């Protein structure tokens, strides 16, 4: 087995490296790939982004958002998490066999003192009944990867804030994540492993899995200039691409209602491929003009605060909504007001 760690903390680059290895690497031997991410959310291949995240909070906290090529649910990562990926040929007994690919990880954790770590359900690793690792797979052209998270010292307060969306505001056909009780591994490890840097935790895991006393003796899989160029191209094509991240979301409906001093306004929006496909407005507000021009300006627009703001820039919204402020109306459309401070 060969070994690779990413020097980047950007989830988009790290997923692009994984995709490049999946598509182009010499897999005569499996590759064990580790990466550590700055705060980010990774949604599953078939999920509705806006059904999984608190967009306003994510924007305010500058949390990176992307979509991976594998299925499964949304996860939050930060610099207290280590992600691992086994990239190998598909021998016909790999896809869906999470036990096979998590067994080396569990063995390593047991050796580090987390003897209660175990697999549970389809693709989770638990300790003391709490989840510390979610796993997913992707198979294509006779190759597959199985990747997962390992929460060593993640800021758990961020998870609920970043992944929470008010349930009564959305009716979606996407695959919603199942929220689980989560925990960090650190307090369950032997004392000598409870105060490691995240890099030292990663390297200790790697040595245990690879069966070497020193990673300098492990076989590596370096990325040459051509590989780096390929990674950059994949990053732009997929993981930094708005259409890949948001445009893959299934159609869904939103209902946003708020009472202002000048009246109540309710927007109902149909979102498809990350854009406003249709919308209507209801309320007891007073405007001097019919609201249809507002609706026309918004149809086909990306469902983001910036895009909605730009689309309405040349309209005097007071003609349509009376004394309700422009910023408040835009906040209502995209629900920016729901951000948790």
Named regions from a protein language model:
Residues 136-137, 150, 258, 265-283:
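Short beta-strand elements
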């Amino acid at each position: 087995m060969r070994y690779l760690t990413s020097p980047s903390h950007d989830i988009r680059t790290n997923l692009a490296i994984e995709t490049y290895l999946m598509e182009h690497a010499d897999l005569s031997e499996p590759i064990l790939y580790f990466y550590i991410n700055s705060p980010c959310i990774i949604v599953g291949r078939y999920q509705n982004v806006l059904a999984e995240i608190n967009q306003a909070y994510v924007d305010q906290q500058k949390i990176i958002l992307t979509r991976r090529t594998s299925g499964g649910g949304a996860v939050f990562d930060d610099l207290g998490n280590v992600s691992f990926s086994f990239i190998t040929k598909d021998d016909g007994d790999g896809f869906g066999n999470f036990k096979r690919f998590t067994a080396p990880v569990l063995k390593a954790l047991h050796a580090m003192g987390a003897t209660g770590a175990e697999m549970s359900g389809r693709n989770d690793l638990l300790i003391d009944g709490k989840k510390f690792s979610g796993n997913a797979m992707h198979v294509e052209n006779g190759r597959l990867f199985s990747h997962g998270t390992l929460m060593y010292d993640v800021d758990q307060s961020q998870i609920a804030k970043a992944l929470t969306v008010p349930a009564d505001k959305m009716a979606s056909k996407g695959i919603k994540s199942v929220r689980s009780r989560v925990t960090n591994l650190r307090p369950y490890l032997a004392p000598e492993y409870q105060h490691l840097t995240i890099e030292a935790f990663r390297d200790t895991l790697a040595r245990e899995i690879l069966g070497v006393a020193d990673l300098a003796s492990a076989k590596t899989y370096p990325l040459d200039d051509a590989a780096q160029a390929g990674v950059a191209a994949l990053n732009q094509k997929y993981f930094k691409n708005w259409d890949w991240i948001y445009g893959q979301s299934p159609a869904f409906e939103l209902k946003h209602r708020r009472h202002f001093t000048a009246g109540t306004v309710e927007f109902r929006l149909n979102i498809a491929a990350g854009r406003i496909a249709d919308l209507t407005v209801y309320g007891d507000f007073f405007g001097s003009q019919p609201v249809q021009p507002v609706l026309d300006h918004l149809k086909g627009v990306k469902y983001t605060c910036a895009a909605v703001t730009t689309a309405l820039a040349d309209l005097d919204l007071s003609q349509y909504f009376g004394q309700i402020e422009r910023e408040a109306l835009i906040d209502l459309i995209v629900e920016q007001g729901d951000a948790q401070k």
